[in-house]
Amino acid sequence: MKHLTEMVRQHKEGKTNGIYAVCSAHPLVLEAAIRYASANQTPLLIEATSNQVDQFGGYTGMTPADFRGFVCQLADSLNFPQDALILGGDHLGPNRWQNLPAAQAMANADDLIKSYVAAGFKKIHLDCSMSCQDDPIPLTDDIVAERAARLAKVAEETCREHFGAADLEYVIGTEVPVPGGAHETLSELAVTTPDAARATLEAHRHAFEKQGLSAIWPRIIALVVQPGVEFDHTNVIDYQPVKATALSQMVENYETLIFEAHSTDYQTPQSLRQLVIDHFAILKVGPALTFALREALFSLAAIEEELVPAKACSGLRQVLENVMLDRPEYWQSHYHGDGNARRLARGYSYSDRVRYYWPDSQIDDAFAHLVRNLADSPIPLPLISQYLPLQYVKVRSGELQPTPRELIINHIQDILAQYHTACEGQ
Protein backbone atom coordinates (compact mmCIF):
# COMPACT_ATOMS: atom_id res chain seq x y z
CA MET A 1 0.00 0.00 0.00
CA LYS A 2 3.02 2.19 -0.51
CA HIS A 3 1.07 4.10 -3.18
CA LEU A 4 -1.37 5.65 -0.69
CA THR A 5 1.19 6.27 2.04
CA GLU A 6 3.49 7.89 -0.48
CA MET A 7 0.65 10.02 -1.89
CA VAL A 8 -0.21 11.29 1.60
CA ARG A 9 3.46 11.96 2.41
CA GLN A 10 3.95 13.97 -0.78
CA HIS A 11 0.73 15.88 -0.21
CA LYS A 12 1.78 16.81 3.32
CA GLU A 13 5.07 18.06 1.87
CA GLY A 14 3.15 20.51 -0.31
CA LYS A 15 2.92 18.71 -3.64
CA THR A 16 -0.89 19.33 -3.83
CA ASN A 17 -1.38 15.85 -5.26
CA GLY A 18 -4.16 13.38 -4.61
CA ILE A 19 -5.80 10.20 -5.82
CA TYR A 20 -9.27 9.44 -7.14
CA ALA A 21 -11.22 6.35 -6.20
CA VAL A 22 -13.32 4.61 -8.85
CA CYS A 23 -16.46 3.39 -7.08
CA SER A 24 -18.14 1.16 -9.62
CA ALA A 25 -18.48 -2.53 -10.38
CA HIS A 26 -19.47 -2.10 -14.03
CA PRO A 27 -17.06 -3.95 -16.35
CA LEU A 28 -16.93 -1.14 -18.95
CA VAL A 29 -16.29 1.52 -16.29
CA LEU A 30 -13.54 -0.61 -14.78
CA GLU A 31 -12.01 -1.32 -18.20
CA ALA A 32 -12.04 2.41 -18.96
CA ALA A 33 -10.36 3.16 -15.63
CA ILE A 34 -7.71 0.43 -15.95
CA ARG A 35 -6.85 1.46 -19.50
CA TYR A 36 -6.68 5.12 -18.51
CA ALA A 37 -4.38 4.41 -15.53
CA SER A 38 -2.23 2.19 -17.74
CA ALA A 39 -1.87 4.86 -20.42
CA ASN A 40 -0.92 7.44 -17.78
CA GLN A 41 1.25 5.04 -15.74
CA THR A 42 -0.50 5.79 -12.46
CA PRO A 43 -1.73 3.49 -9.70
CA LEU A 44 -5.47 2.86 -9.70
CA LEU A 45 -7.72 2.85 -6.65
CA ILE A 46 -10.93 0.86 -7.13
CA GLU A 47 -13.46 0.67 -4.33
CA ALA A 48 -16.45 -1.53 -3.63
CA THR A 49 -19.18 -0.29 -1.31
CA SER A 50 -20.90 -2.34 1.35
CA ASN A 51 -24.08 -2.14 -0.76
CA GLN A 52 -22.43 -3.51 -3.91
CA VAL A 53 -20.28 -6.24 -2.43
CA ASP A 54 -20.57 -8.11 0.87
CA GLN A 55 -20.18 -11.58 2.36
CA PHE A 56 -23.69 -12.43 1.09
CA GLY A 57 -23.12 -11.02 -2.41
CA GLY A 58 -24.48 -7.45 -2.18
CA TYR A 59 -26.55 -6.10 -5.07
CA THR A 60 -23.89 -7.16 -7.60
CA GLY A 61 -24.03 -10.78 -6.42
CA MET A 62 -20.29 -10.61 -5.67
CA THR A 63 -18.45 -11.33 -2.44
CA PRO A 64 -15.22 -9.37 -1.79
CA ALA A 65 -13.19 -12.34 -3.06
CA ASP A 66 -15.34 -12.47 -6.21
CA PHE A 67 -14.88 -8.73 -6.77
CA ARG A 68 -11.12 -8.95 -6.32
CA GLY A 69 -10.96 -11.89 -8.74
CA PHE A 70 -13.09 -10.03 -11.27
CA VAL A 71 -10.97 -6.85 -11.09
CA CYS A 72 -7.64 -8.71 -11.14
CA GLN A 73 -8.71 -10.83 -14.11
CA LEU A 74 -9.70 -7.67 -15.98
CA ALA A 75 -6.40 -6.01 -15.06
CA ASP A 76 -4.45 -9.07 -16.24
CA SER A 77 -6.32 -9.13 -19.55
CA LEU A 78 -5.34 -5.48 -20.06
CA ASN A 79 -1.71 -6.02 -18.95
CA PHE A 80 -2.13 -3.74 -15.95
CA PRO A 81 0.24 -4.68 -13.11
CA GLN A 82 -1.58 -5.90 -10.01
CA ASP A 83 0.89 -4.12 -7.75
CA ALA A 84 -0.40 -0.83 -9.18
CA LEU A 85 -3.96 -1.80 -8.22
CA ILE A 86 -5.33 -0.69 -4.84
CA LEU A 87 -8.61 -2.17 -3.67
CA GLY A 88 -10.71 -0.33 -1.11
CA GLY A 89 -13.88 -1.05 0.83
CA ASP A 90 -16.27 1.86 1.30
CA HIS A 91 -18.82 2.41 4.09
CA LEU A 92 -17.84 -0.83 5.81
CA GLY A 93 -19.93 -1.26 8.94
CA PRO A 94 -23.56 -2.04 9.77
CA ASN A 95 -24.90 -0.01 6.81
CA ARG A 96 -26.70 -2.95 5.16
CA TRP A 97 -28.27 -4.12 8.43
CA GLN A 98 -29.72 -0.96 9.96
CA ASN A 99 -33.08 -2.72 10.30
CA LEU A 100 -31.54 -5.26 12.71
CA PRO A 101 -30.70 -4.83 16.41
CA ALA A 102 -27.21 -3.38 16.88
CA ALA A 103 -25.70 -6.60 18.27
CA GLN A 104 -26.79 -8.57 15.22
CA ALA A 105 -25.87 -5.79 12.76
CA MET A 106 -22.38 -5.46 14.23
CA ALA A 107 -21.85 -9.24 14.15
CA ASN A 108 -22.61 -9.05 10.42
CA ALA A 109 -20.26 -6.05 10.15
CA ASP A 110 -17.47 -8.11 11.79
CA ASP A 111 -17.92 -10.76 9.10
CA LEU A 112 -18.09 -8.08 6.39
CA ILE A 113 -14.71 -6.71 7.49
CA LYS A 114 -13.21 -10.21 7.66
CA SER A 115 -14.38 -10.98 4.12
CA TYR A 116 -12.95 -7.73 2.68
CA VAL A 117 -9.60 -8.00 4.45
CA ALA A 118 -9.17 -11.72 3.74
CA ALA A 119 -9.80 -11.00 0.04
CA GLY A 120 -6.88 -8.56 -0.05
CA PHE A 121 -8.61 -5.18 0.18
CA LYS A 122 -6.11 -2.81 1.78
CA LYS A 123 -7.92 0.54 2.07
CA ILE A 124 -10.69 0.17 4.62
CA HIS A 125 -13.30 2.85 5.32
CA LEU A 126 -14.78 2.17 8.75
CA ASP A 127 -18.25 3.73 8.86
CA CYS A 128 -20.42 2.94 11.87
CA SER A 129 -22.35 6.21 11.79
CA MET A 130 -25.75 4.72 11.09
CA SER A 131 -28.26 3.87 13.81
CA CYS A 132 -29.49 0.29 14.00
CA GLN A 133 -32.99 -0.85 14.97
CA ASP A 134 -32.55 -0.42 18.74
CA ASP A 135 -30.15 2.56 18.64
CA PRO A 136 -30.74 6.22 19.49
CA ILE A 137 -30.83 8.61 16.51
CA PRO A 138 -28.28 10.02 15.92
CA LEU A 139 -25.52 8.00 17.52
CA THR A 140 -22.96 9.77 19.70
CA ASP A 141 -19.39 10.18 18.48
CA ASP A 142 -18.27 7.78 21.20
CA ILE A 143 -20.57 4.92 20.13
CA VAL A 144 -19.62 5.40 16.47
CA ALA A 145 -15.92 5.37 17.37
CA GLU A 146 -16.22 2.34 19.68
CA ARG A 147 -17.85 0.35 16.89
CA ALA A 148 -15.22 1.48 14.37
CA ALA A 149 -12.43 0.44 16.77
CA ARG A 150 -14.05 -2.96 17.21
CA LEU A 151 -14.04 -3.41 13.42
CA ALA A 152 -10.44 -2.18 13.16
CA LYS A 153 -9.39 -4.86 15.64
CA VAL A 154 -11.15 -7.52 13.55
CA ALA A 155 -9.45 -6.12 10.43
CA GLU A 156 -5.97 -6.17 11.98
CA GLU A 157 -6.38 -9.74 13.27
CA THR A 158 -7.72 -10.94 9.90
CA CYS A 159 -4.89 -9.26 7.99
CA ARG A 160 -2.20 -10.82 10.18
CA GLU A 161 -3.88 -14.22 9.97
CA HIS A 162 -4.06 -14.21 6.15
CA PHE A 163 -0.99 -12.19 5.14
CA GLY A 164 1.39 -12.51 8.09
CA ALA A 165 1.47 -8.77 8.78
CA ALA A 166 -0.98 -5.91 9.14
CA ASP A 167 -0.53 -3.36 6.35
CA LEU A 168 -4.05 -1.97 6.08
CA GLU A 169 -4.77 1.72 5.70
CA TYR A 170 -7.90 3.17 7.20
CA VAL A 171 -10.32 5.94 6.49
CA ILE A 172 -12.62 7.02 9.30
CA GLY A 173 -15.39 9.55 9.44
CA THR A 174 -19.09 9.77 9.80
CA GLU A 175 -20.19 13.03 8.22
CA VAL A 176 -20.71 11.65 4.76
CA PRO A 177 -23.40 12.48 2.21
CA VAL A 178 -25.99 9.80 1.56
CA PRO A 179 -24.14 7.10 -0.43
CA GLY A 180 -24.91 7.57 -4.13
CA GLY A 181 -26.28 11.10 -3.93
CA ALA A 182 -28.98 12.88 -1.98
CA HIS A 183 -32.57 11.64 -2.01
CA GLU A 184 -34.15 15.08 -1.83
CA THR A 185 -33.76 18.34 -3.72
CA LEU A 186 -30.85 20.39 -2.44
CA SER A 187 -30.17 24.07 -2.16
CA GLU A 188 -27.59 24.55 0.60
CA LEU A 189 -25.21 22.19 2.33
CA ALA A 190 -23.48 22.48 5.70
CA VAL A 191 -19.71 22.08 5.62
CA THR A 192 -18.22 19.96 8.42
CA THR A 193 -16.94 22.27 11.15
CA PRO A 194 -13.34 21.97 12.35
CA ASP A 195 -14.66 21.23 15.85
CA ALA A 196 -16.80 18.35 14.57
CA ALA A 197 -13.85 16.94 12.62
CA ARG A 198 -11.59 17.19 15.67
CA ALA A 199 -14.25 15.56 17.86
CA THR A 200 -14.55 12.64 15.42
CA LEU A 201 -10.77 12.20 15.37
CA GLU A 202 -10.41 12.37 19.15
CA ALA A 203 -13.30 9.97 19.76
CA HIS A 204 -11.71 7.48 17.37
CA ARG A 205 -8.23 7.95 18.83
CA HIS A 206 -9.58 7.27 22.34
CA ALA A 207 -11.61 4.24 21.18
CA PHE A 208 -8.59 2.80 19.35
CA GLU A 209 -6.46 3.23 22.48
CA LYS A 210 -9.05 1.32 24.53
CA GLN A 211 -8.80 -1.55 22.04
CA GLY A 212 -5.00 -1.53 22.24
CA LEU A 213 -4.73 -0.17 18.71
CA SER A 214 -2.72 3.02 19.32
CA ALA A 215 0.09 1.72 17.11
CA ILE A 216 -2.10 1.74 13.99
CA TRP A 217 -3.00 5.44 14.26
CA PRO A 218 -0.38 6.49 11.63
CA ARG A 219 -2.16 4.13 9.20
CA ILE A 220 -5.36 6.12 9.53
CA ILE A 221 -4.69 8.20 6.45
CA ALA A 222 -7.95 10.07 5.90
CA LEU A 223 -11.02 11.49 7.55
CA VAL A 224 -14.27 11.66 5.60
CA VAL A 225 -15.80 15.12 5.89
CA GLN A 226 -18.36 17.20 4.04
CA PRO A 227 -16.54 20.00 2.16
CA GLY A 228 -19.84 21.28 0.77
CA VAL A 229 -20.24 19.17 -2.37
CA GLU A 230 -23.28 17.12 -3.31
CA PHE A 231 -25.70 16.39 -6.12
CA ASP A 232 -29.33 15.46 -6.34
CA HIS A 233 -31.34 14.42 -9.39
CA THR A 234 -30.92 17.57 -11.48
CA ASN A 235 -28.64 19.89 -9.49
CA VAL A 236 -25.06 20.04 -8.28
CA ILE A 237 -23.86 21.96 -5.25
CA ASP A 238 -20.46 23.24 -6.33
CA TYR A 239 -17.48 23.45 -4.04
CA GLN A 240 -17.06 26.90 -2.50
CA PRO A 241 -13.51 27.05 -1.11
CA VAL A 242 -14.19 30.03 1.14
CA LYS A 243 -16.77 28.00 3.10
CA ALA A 244 -14.26 25.21 3.72
CA THR A 245 -11.23 27.35 4.61
CA ALA A 246 -11.30 26.67 8.35
CA LEU A 247 -11.80 22.94 7.78
CA SER A 248 -9.00 22.84 5.22
CA GLN A 249 -6.58 24.61 7.58
CA MET A 250 -7.48 22.33 10.49
CA VAL A 251 -6.06 19.18 8.85
CA GLU A 252 -2.69 20.86 8.37
CA ASN A 253 -2.07 20.24 12.08
CA TYR A 254 -2.15 16.45 11.59
CA GLU A 255 1.08 15.00 10.28
CA THR A 256 -0.22 11.91 8.46
CA LEU A 257 -3.84 12.83 7.73
CA ILE A 258 -5.73 14.18 4.73
CA PHE A 259 -9.44 14.44 3.97
CA GLU A 260 -11.53 12.15 1.79
CA ALA A 261 -14.40 13.74 -0.14
CA HIS A 262 -17.43 11.69 -1.16
CA SER A 263 -20.03 12.61 -3.81
CA THR A 264 -17.58 14.69 -5.83
CA ASP A 265 -19.39 13.53 -8.99
CA TYR A 266 -20.32 16.31 -11.46
CA GLN A 267 -18.07 18.94 -9.85
CA THR A 268 -16.32 21.15 -12.40
CA PRO A 269 -12.67 20.37 -13.22
CA GLN A 270 -11.72 23.61 -11.45
CA SER A 271 -13.58 22.55 -8.30
CA LEU A 272 -12.00 19.09 -8.33
CA ARG A 273 -8.54 20.64 -8.55
CA GLN A 274 -9.30 23.10 -5.74
CA LEU A 275 -10.61 20.30 -3.52
CA VAL A 276 -7.28 18.50 -3.83
CA ILE A 277 -5.30 21.69 -3.18
CA ASP A 278 -7.42 22.23 -0.05
CA HIS A 279 -6.42 18.77 1.29
CA PHE A 280 -9.56 16.87 0.22
CA ALA A 281 -7.01 14.71 -1.53
CA ILE A 282 -8.98 11.49 -1.99
CA LEU A 283 -11.82 12.13 -4.43
CA LYS A 284 -14.53 9.49 -4.68
CA VAL A 285 -16.35 9.15 -8.01
CA GLY A 286 -18.98 6.61 -9.00
CA PRO A 287 -22.34 7.75 -10.38
CA ALA A 288 -20.66 10.25 -12.75
CA LEU A 289 -18.87 7.35 -14.44
CA THR A 290 -21.98 5.22 -14.91
CA PHE A 291 -23.82 8.41 -15.95
CA ALA A 292 -21.22 8.81 -18.73
CA LEU A 293 -21.67 5.14 -19.65
CA ARG A 294 -25.43 5.70 -19.87
CA GLU A 295 -24.95 8.85 -21.98
CA ALA A 296 -22.80 6.92 -24.45
CA LEU A 297 -25.28 4.03 -24.64
CA PHE A 298 -28.24 6.37 -25.21
CA SER A 299 -26.25 8.11 -27.96
CA LEU A 300 -25.41 4.80 -29.62
CA ALA A 301 -29.06 3.72 -29.34
CA ALA A 302 -30.06 6.93 -31.17
CA ILE A 303 -27.47 6.21 -33.87
CA GLU A 304 -28.77 2.64 -34.15
CA GLU A 305 -32.31 3.92 -34.78
CA GLU A 306 -31.00 6.01 -37.68
CA LEU A 307 -29.12 3.11 -39.26
CA VAL A 308 -31.00 -0.10 -38.49
CA PRO A 309 -34.58 -1.07 -39.45
CA ALA A 310 -36.90 -0.77 -36.45
CA LYS A 311 -37.62 -4.50 -36.24
CA ALA A 312 -33.89 -5.29 -36.07
CA CYS A 313 -33.04 -2.65 -33.43
CA SER A 314 -31.94 -3.64 -29.93
CA GLY A 315 -34.63 -1.50 -28.29
CA LEU A 316 -32.15 -0.90 -25.45
CA ARG A 317 -33.92 2.15 -24.06
CA GLN A 318 -37.35 0.50 -24.01
CA VAL A 319 -35.95 -2.70 -22.50
CA LEU A 320 -34.27 -0.61 -19.81
CA GLU A 321 -37.48 1.29 -19.07
CA ASN A 322 -39.52 -1.92 -18.91
CA VAL A 323 -37.12 -3.59 -16.48
CA MET A 324 -37.03 -0.48 -14.26
CA LEU A 325 -40.83 -0.42 -14.17
CA ASP A 326 -41.02 -4.16 -13.45
CA ARG A 327 -38.47 -3.90 -10.62
CA PRO A 328 -38.82 -0.41 -9.15
CA GLU A 329 -37.07 -1.09 -5.83
CA TYR A 330 -33.87 0.76 -6.76
CA TRP A 331 -35.52 4.03 -7.85
CA GLN A 332 -39.04 4.24 -6.42
CA SER A 333 -38.11 5.83 -3.08
CA HIS A 334 -35.71 8.27 -4.77
CA TYR A 335 -37.69 9.68 -7.70
CA HIS A 336 -40.80 11.76 -7.03
CA GLY A 337 -43.30 13.84 -8.99
CA ASP A 338 -45.74 12.92 -11.75
CA GLY A 339 -45.28 10.11 -14.26
CA ASN A 340 -43.29 12.22 -16.69
CA ALA A 341 -40.95 13.56 -14.00
CA ARG A 342 -40.23 10.03 -12.82
CA ARG A 343 -39.70 8.82 -16.39
CA LEU A 344 -37.15 11.58 -16.99
CA ALA A 345 -35.43 10.80 -13.68
CA ARG A 346 -35.18 7.10 -14.52
CA GLY A 347 -33.32 7.95 -17.69
CA TYR A 348 -31.37 11.07 -16.90
CA SER A 349 -31.03 11.75 -13.16
CA TYR A 350 -27.58 12.66 -11.84
CA SER A 351 -28.18 10.12 -9.08
CA ASP A 352 -28.15 7.52 -11.87
CA ARG A 353 -30.25 4.86 -10.20
CA VAL A 354 -30.24 3.13 -13.58
CA ARG A 355 -26.75 1.86 -12.69
CA TYR A 356 -28.35 -0.81 -10.51
CA TYR A 357 -30.04 -2.33 -13.57
CA TRP A 358 -27.16 -2.83 -16.02
CA PRO A 359 -26.39 -6.37 -14.74
CA ASP A 360 -29.96 -7.51 -15.61
CA SER A 361 -29.81 -10.25 -18.26
CA GLN A 362 -32.49 -8.67 -20.50
CA ILE A 363 -30.67 -5.34 -20.50
CA ASP A 364 -27.31 -7.02 -21.01
CA ASP A 365 -28.74 -8.90 -24.02
CA ALA A 366 -30.07 -5.63 -25.47
CA PHE A 367 -26.67 -3.99 -24.94
CA ALA A 368 -24.92 -6.87 -26.76
CA HIS A 369 -27.50 -6.59 -29.58
CA LEU A 370 -26.84 -2.83 -29.87
CA VAL A 371 -23.08 -3.34 -30.08
CA ARG A 372 -23.49 -6.10 -32.70
CA ASN A 373 -25.76 -3.92 -34.82
CA LEU A 374 -23.28 -1.03 -34.82
CA ALA A 375 -20.16 -3.17 -35.22
CA ASP A 376 -21.30 -4.68 -38.53
CA SER A 377 -20.31 -1.63 -40.58
CA PRO A 378 -18.54 1.66 -39.83
CA ILE A 379 -20.65 4.25 -38.02
CA PRO A 380 -21.02 7.28 -40.33
CA LEU A 381 -18.94 10.19 -39.06
CA PRO A 382 -21.78 12.74 -39.23
CA LEU A 383 -23.78 10.59 -36.78
CA ILE A 384 -20.84 10.41 -34.38
CA SER A 385 -20.56 14.19 -34.68
CA GLN A 386 -24.28 14.54 -33.93
CA TYR A 387 -24.49 12.24 -30.91
CA LEU A 388 -20.94 11.98 -29.49
CA PRO A 389 -19.29 15.27 -30.52
CA LEU A 390 -16.34 15.02 -28.10
CA GLN A 391 -15.49 11.58 -29.42
CA TYR A 392 -15.96 12.78 -33.01
CA VAL A 393 -13.03 15.19 -32.60
CA LYS A 394 -10.79 12.32 -31.48
CA VAL A 395 -12.01 10.03 -34.26
CA ARG A 396 -11.23 12.71 -36.85
CA SER A 397 -7.75 13.29 -35.44
CA GLY A 398 -7.03 9.55 -35.63
CA GLU A 399 -6.62 8.95 -31.89
CA LEU A 400 -9.87 7.00 -31.44
CA GLN A 401 -11.36 4.05 -33.33
CA PRO A 402 -15.08 4.64 -34.10
CA THR A 403 -16.26 1.26 -32.78
CA PRO A 404 -19.11 1.08 -30.25
CA ARG A 405 -16.91 -0.19 -27.40
CA GLU A 406 -14.15 2.35 -27.99
CA LEU A 407 -16.65 5.22 -28.14
CA ILE A 408 -18.19 4.13 -24.82
CA ILE A 409 -14.81 3.64 -23.11
CA ASN A 410 -13.53 7.00 -24.33
CA HIS A 411 -16.64 8.85 -23.17
CA ILE A 412 -16.14 7.44 -19.66
CA GLN A 413 -12.45 8.32 -19.82
CA ASP A 414 -13.33 11.98 -20.42
CA ILE A 415 -14.60 12.03 -16.81
CA LEU A 416 -11.59 10.11 -15.51
CA ALA A 417 -9.32 12.65 -17.22
CA GLN A 418 -10.82 15.44 -15.11
CA TYR A 419 -10.01 13.52 -11.94
CA HIS A 420 -6.52 12.61 -13.12
CA THR A 421 -5.75 16.27 -13.84
CA ALA A 422 -7.15 17.34 -10.46
CA CYS A 423 -4.94 14.83 -8.64
CA GLU A 424 -1.68 15.30 -10.55
CA GLY A 425 -0.19 17.90 -8.23
CA GLN A 426 2.89 19.96 -8.91
Swiss-Prot record:
Functional pathway: Carbohydrate metabolism; D-tagatose 6-phosphate degradation; D-glyceraldehyde 3-phosphate and glycerone phosphate from D-tagatose 6-phosphate: step 2/2
GO biological process terms, semicolon-separated: carbohydrate metabolic process; D-tagatose 6-phosphate catabolic process; phosphoenolpyruvate-dependent sugar phosphotransferase system
Bridged cysteine pairs (disulfide): none
Source organism, top-level taxon: Bacteria
InterPro entries, per the entry: Aldolase_TIM, GatZ/KbaZ-like, GatZ_KbaZ_carbometab, TagBP_ald_KbaZ
GO cellular component, one term: plasma membrane
Subunit text: Forms a complex with KbaY.
Record PANTHER family: D-TAGATOSE-1,6-BISPHOSPHATE ALDOLASE SUBUNIT KBAZ, N-ACETYLGALACTOSAMINE PERMEASE II COMPONENT-RELATED
Family: Belongs to the GatZ/KbaZ family. KbaZ subfamily.
Protein's job: Component of the tagatose-1,6-bisphosphate aldolase KbaYZ that is required for full activity and stability of the Y subunit. Could have a chaperone-like function for the proper and stable folding of KbaY. When expressed alone, KbaZ does not show any aldolase activity.
HAMAP family the UniProt entry points to: Tagatose_aldol_KbaZ
Full protein name: D-tagatose-1,6-bisphosphate aldolase subunit KbaZ
